């Protein structure tokens, strides 16, 4: 059964452009080989980690949103686990309602302040 997933991948911040392109190519190849559909692959840049991971205090974040099934997730996570460049990853199954962006809230007008006596 095809479901929508999102995965956050944190890699070592000092990787070169060729290594980063290789990592993103590997992720897209895995999704394509399991007949998944890639919706979004974003580089969120280098950010400070909440705590040191494998002696790194910073990491480069990638966001991946795709459609796939359970064998695709299992293979993607297996390959990420074996890659030494990957510090952490997390995959989450999305609900159908979460696929659409939330509507924007209307601006709130503030009432004039009343002076205290």
Curated annotation (Swiss-Prot):
One of its GO terms (cellular component) is cytosolic small ribosomal subunit. GO terms for biological process: translation. Keywords: Ribonucleoprotein, Ribosomal protein, RNA-binding, rRNA-binding. SUPFAM superfamilies: Ribosomal protein S6 (SSF54995). InterPro entries: Ribosomal_bS6, Ribosomal_bS6_sf, Ribosomal_S6_plastid/chlpt, Transl_elong_EF1B/ribsomal_bS6. Residues 99-117 have a biased composition (Low complexity). GO terms for molecular function: small ribosomal subunit rRNA binding; structural constituent of ribosome. Residues 96-117 are annotated as: Disordered. Belongs to the bacterial ribosomal protein bS6 family. PANTHER family: MITOCHONDRIAL 28S RIBOSOMAL PROTEIN S6, SMALL RIBOSOMAL SUBUNIT PROTEIN BS6M. Binds together with bS18 to 16S ribosomal RNA. This is Small ribosomal subunit protein bS6.
